[in-house]
């Protein structure tokens, strides 16, 4: 009897094979040749520290058991670090102490060896954790260098499901679909978190169904600064323009559509004059009141 994936046998006795990866995910795993490492970065100040603390590592590793079944050479590593905003309440809670000293105090309270902690600055050459808001994140890396990220989500399920994990792994095999979000006309932002913006479905790392967590890449494009849309853009996202495009910008979009590009358009009430010149190109128009 062994607990090492390479030495284990598996048999799924469930009627619907719910303890086994789907056929599509199995195909992805077969293509991922060579070594693979999943590195989990955990902030000592993060409320999710206990998800992958040293005493919880075995349980955490078990979350990937369906994947190690098909690729037993997967290695899992854990990096513990510290970082917090300069206006954090921790500075009031621990007066006259710097961030490192506070981290050591918190580590001791959590029965964690503070000597194992690194600062986010020390890790910056390998990963910019600021882009993850210093929250829990995993980096999946192949021996050939390709990388993908896995995050926890602010919902009831919390952990990524097979859908999100396989979507991340697939990004290391094929060029992900790239979405270009048009800017420059007071469109709804795909990065800001305001009520009127679209970051939740586009780039929010903690939202399970955001584009970046479902296998897409997204970049912003200002057509005023361009002569053509890059060839690696597959989809254009135009999110409720408030000012009209120039003839040059219209021509750029026309060429994109002629080469077979796709477009996702959202238009708000009362924007017919702004949106219809663009929509006419594809045989559509917004009617009054729509």
Task: Indicate where each model-derived feature is located.
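Short, surface-exposed patches at the edges or C-terminal ends of soluble domains, predominantly
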Residues: 1-290
């Amino acid at each position: 009897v062994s607990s090492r994936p390479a030495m284990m046998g598996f048999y799924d006795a469930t009627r619907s094979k719910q303890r086994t990866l789907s056929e599509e995910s199995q195909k992805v795993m077969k293509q991922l040749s060579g070594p693979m490492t999943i590195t989990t970065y955990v902030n000592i100040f993060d409320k999710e520290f206990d998800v992958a603390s040293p005493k919880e590592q075995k349980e955490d590793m078990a979350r990937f058991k369906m994947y190690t079944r098909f690729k037993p050479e997967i290695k899992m590593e854990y990096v513990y670090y510290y970082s917090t905003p300069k206006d954090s309440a921790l500075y009031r809670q621990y007066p006259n102490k710097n961030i490192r000293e506070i981290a050591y105090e918190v580590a001791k309270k959590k029965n964690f060896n503070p000597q194992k902690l690194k600062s986010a600055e020390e890790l910056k050459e390998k990963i910019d954790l600021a882009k993850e808001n210093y929250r829990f994140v995993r980096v999946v890396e192949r021996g050939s260098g390709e990388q993908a990220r896995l995050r926890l989500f602010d919902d009831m399920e919390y952990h990524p499901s097979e859908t999100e994990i396989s979507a991340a792994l697939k990004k290391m095999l094929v060029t992900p679909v790239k979405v270009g979000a048009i800017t420059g006309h007071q469109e709804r932002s795909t990065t800001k978190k305001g009520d009127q913006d679209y970051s939740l479905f586009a780039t929010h790392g903690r939202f399970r169904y955001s584009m970046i967590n479902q296998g897409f890449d997204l970049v912003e494009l200002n057509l005023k600064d361009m002569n053509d849309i890059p060839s690696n853009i597959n989809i254009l996202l135009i999110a409720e323009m408030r000012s009209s495009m120039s003839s040059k910008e219209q021509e750029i979009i026309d060429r994109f559509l002629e080469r077979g590009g796709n477009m996702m358009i959202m238009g708000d009430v009362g924007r017919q004059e702004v949106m219809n010149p663009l929509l006419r190109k594809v045989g559509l128009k917004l009617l009054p009141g729509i």
